[in-house]
Amino acid sequence: GQPHEGQPAPQEGEEAEVVEIPEYFTAKRKSVVTYPADLFEKHTWHDGSPMSVADFVMYLILSLDPGTEGSEIYDASQVGKVESFKSSFKGFNITSTDPLVIEYYSDVWYLDAEYNVTDWWPYYDYGEGPWHMMALGVLAETDEELAFSGDKSEALKVEWLSYISGPSLEILRENLDQALEEDYIPYAATLGKFISAEEAADRYNNLLNWYRIQGHFFVNSGPFYLNKVFPVEKTLTLTRYQDYQDPSGKWDLFGTPMIADLEVDGPGRVKSGEEAVFDAYVTFEDAP
């Protein structure tokens, strides 16, 4: 269903709050994004997990839940951000999963057309995030072991969550063990419609193997993955992701600036008041 005014997804074992929804909403902007039909076949996270609809839904949930009172990961420092978002947010609807089609309704619009497209790609403030990676952070913050924000970490006197280094890693590893043992599906009342127990187990095992090899939990899906982290030296290494779906030469077309050549042909002189015709020829590298 479509969320109404950012109602938080019920936690497992809780009854969903009944909210009276108006017969219809109005919105100043409707964005429809259709993803490639083979998105979930070819696009994988760096730990080998295929991307799924659940990654997008988790992103929507975490756009609202931290700043919503009553949430198990409620963060007072996020209230302003969430309330600002909710003031213009009118709806989110997945009309198809094959291919993935996402409708988004909002009262915020822009003069530049490209900014009016909202894709809901799971990209957080610190980069992309698959649902199973984010789930470890949710578990840790729910138990007040770590906090997603610096403000909350100071308020709770706990470590500011880091997926790449520091004391967070041991805590995240413990939560990964818990997730594996319990077949944990975060926000199960909602995400349980998109995640099976088998998929959850596969994802967590992929993340465990990733951690054993890479030594961190930061999983993305771009052309380079975070290989090694050296926090003392403040350096890191990135390595090409061999299974990235786009060929390396996909954007070669834009390697050379397409500066056109213009030639105008017409009479050299024109008498005032008379009609004149000029032909304009626009070429790039001698081609029209």
Region roles according to the model:
Residues 1-288:
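The feature preferentially marks the first beta-strand/turn patch immediately downstream
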